[in-house]
């Protein structure tokens, strides 16, 4: 409310819920391009004259934007990053980049459950192992949804461990 002269900028998370990543049960939820557009448009027009929007694709609790909203295969990673950036920068609001977005970082590709550090991922894996899920099935969920995807260090170069360290963990 502009008359109250308080907050004039918001971080809205409706877009972050579109695919079910943080729904609590880790089940992917399908969405369509028109649904994505509706959410984005609602915040563009909904704040008209009364506030200012924050524009972002993710943060430390969500998978990497290119892996989540684009295609992170070598063939399409760069195009996906440019598409997401163009969409974000073409909107009204202040863009926020999570560290690594500016160089197109994608989800980490771990090969074992034990490589995940996040407590939410560990609890999910333990629960599903107790239910008899295969490691392959559990890994498919972790590779897509784990918060570890956005919690790896900034990649400095193409060397082993991204030039960040010679130590095996955290990368």
Regions found by a protein language model. Give the residues of each.
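Active-site and adjacent substrate-binding regions of carbohydrate-active enzymes
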Residues: 1-171
């Amino acid at each position: 409310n502009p008359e109250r002269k308080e907050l004039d900028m918001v971080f809205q998370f409706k877009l972050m819920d579109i695919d079910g990543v943080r729904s609590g049960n880790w089940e992917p939820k399908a969405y369509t391009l028109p649904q994505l557009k509706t959410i984005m448009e609602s915040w563009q027009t909904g704040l008209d004259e009364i506030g200012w929007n924050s524009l972002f694709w993710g943060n430390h609790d969500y998978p990497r934007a290119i892996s989540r909203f684009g295609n992170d295969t070598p063939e399409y990673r760069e195009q996906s990053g440019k598409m997401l950036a163009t969409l974000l920068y073409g909107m009204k609001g202040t863009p926020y980049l999570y560290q690594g977005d500016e160089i197109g970082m994608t989800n980490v590709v771990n090969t074992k459950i034990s490589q995940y550090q996040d407590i939410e991922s560990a609890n999910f894996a333990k629960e599903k192992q107790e239910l008899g899920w295969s490691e392959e099935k559990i890994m498919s969920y972790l590779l897509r949804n784990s918060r570890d995807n956005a919690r790896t260090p900034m990649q400095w170069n193409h060397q082993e461990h991204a030039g960040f360290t010679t130590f095996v963990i955290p990368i």
